[in-house]
Structures are given as C-alpha cells and as structure tokens.
Amino acid sequence: MMKQNPILITGGTGTVGSRIASRLIKLGYRVRIASRKKGALADAEYVYFNWKYASSFTPALEQVKQIYLVAPVGVFDPAPYVLPFLKEAKRLGAKRVVMQSASVVSENGPVFGALHQAVREFPEWTVLRPSYFMQNFINVQHRMSIQTEGRITTASGEGKLGFIDADDIAETAVRALIDDVPHQTHHILTGPEALSYAEAAEIIGAAAGRRVEHVSISRSELQHKMEAGGLPADYAHFMAKLDEAISHGAEHRVTDTVKRVTGKEPRSLSEFAAAHAAYWTSFWTE
C-alpha cells in the first residue's frame, strides 16, 4: 500500500531523479514526477511542470511534504525560477527539501548559492553535493568523442575527481527523503577513489578494449567548445572555470558519505566501465 502524500521529484525523468523515483516506488512510496514530458515509469504520477511557468508550480506541489529539487539545467542564475517555487512549496505545507547541487560549486557561490540558503529555511533539509557523474562518460558530454576519436577533452589538466555513479547519488537521496531523522546537512558525495581524467581514460580504454586518451585544453578553448555546442555564454564560462578549478585540486577528495548514509560501498569507475563498455565501442572499429 502506497503512503498517502506524494514525494515530488523535479527533474524526475533525468539521470538521478528517475533512479530515485524507481527506488521510492519499490519501497511503497507514492511518487509524483514534475516534468515537461511523461516518462516510462508506469507506477509514477506525472504532472506537467515548467520552470518558466509559475502556473505549473501549484498543481505539482499540492499535498506534497517532501521534495527532491533539481534546478533548471544550463541556467547560470536559476534563483528567479526556483525561489518562487520554494516559496509556493512552503505556503502549501512542504516540510522537507532535498536539493541536488554539486561538490565543485561553493556553498555561497554562483548558480546554487541563493538556493542553498533558501532550502535551509525549510524545517527539514539536505543538500547533496556530488562530484562528477560517471554517467558523463556514457552521455552527450563525452560518449561521442570516446566512440569516434578515442578522446576525452577537458580543461582539468591533471586534477583529480571522485567520480560517482548516479545510482549511489540516488541511494543517498532516498535516505535523505525518507529517513525519520532529517539529515540537516550538506553531503559531499564521491566514489571510492580520486582519479584524473587521464586515469579515467585508461580505465575506460581497458574496459572497451581500445586506446582512450585525455586531451587537456585551455579554459577559453573549452568555453568556446561549449558555446558551439549550444550552451549560453555565461553558463559556458562558468563551467569552463570549474574545469580550471579542478586542475588546481578543487575536486581532489574522497568522502565516506555514501557508505555512512546508505550502508553500501560506492561503485568504482572500474566496475562502472566494465558494465558499460558497449557504450564506447558502438561506432568504433580497429
């Protein structure tokens, strides 16, 4: 029997949100996914939601006590969209908000800073700050260049990151949403080891049975590349600066948060690569 009040997931058809939704449903929770399109999860309730239209906020938030919040993607300043949403959530009685942020973005910094503060005004809150997703290697960010060129291109130099599987983020998010005692903290989430992109490329190449290399470019080159790919200039500038920060050690850390919160060891990149090798060989021949 499903619990009475729905748990709202914004970005519920995305990489992490879809994983959270499926886990909550298996645990017997009622899940409402706020999205512009209907997904494939049969037992979820879908409601039309668009950050640009505040009129879509109230129907999504009715009867909701717990929210998983993913800010609009690719927007340098999401506060004008998200703060009115949180205000409406509070008015309608939402009690707990779990927000997805990023470990490389400072708590009071650009993009998420104002949202971090707003989330903390709820009676129960958690901010998840994961390192870079392992899924970036199998989606639009890096998959095609690995397939066609055997390359991963960044401005991160030799900087290391605690790459994390989205499944481990989702497991942590579920605990933050449903644990009896609210977490009331920022969770820095990483995988079990810190790796450079060159080391990641070597692991991926070994799994795929081919040579994969990391190509390091300048921050400005990366920004131009991102703009050419369709990112707004301000957001491309911000993202390229994050890569530069990584090159100086901003992401060189490993935490035990996933294990502490979920009781499970996070997945390694070697394990992830072995399970996803087919993603990097589809268009490649010797």
UniProtKB/Swiss-Prot annotation:
It comes from the Bacteria. InterPro entries: Ergot_Alk_Oxidoreductase (IPR051604), NAD(P)-bd_dom_sf (IPR036291), NmrA-like (IPR008030). The keyword Ion transport does not apply. It is an enzyme of class 1 (oxidoreductase). Signal peptide: none annotated. GO terms for molecular function: oxidoreductase activity. Belongs to the NmrA-type oxidoreductase family. This is Uncharacterized oxidoreductase YesF. It comes from Bacillus subtilis (strain 168). The lineage of its organism: Bacteria, Bacillati, Bacillota, Bacilli, Bacillales.
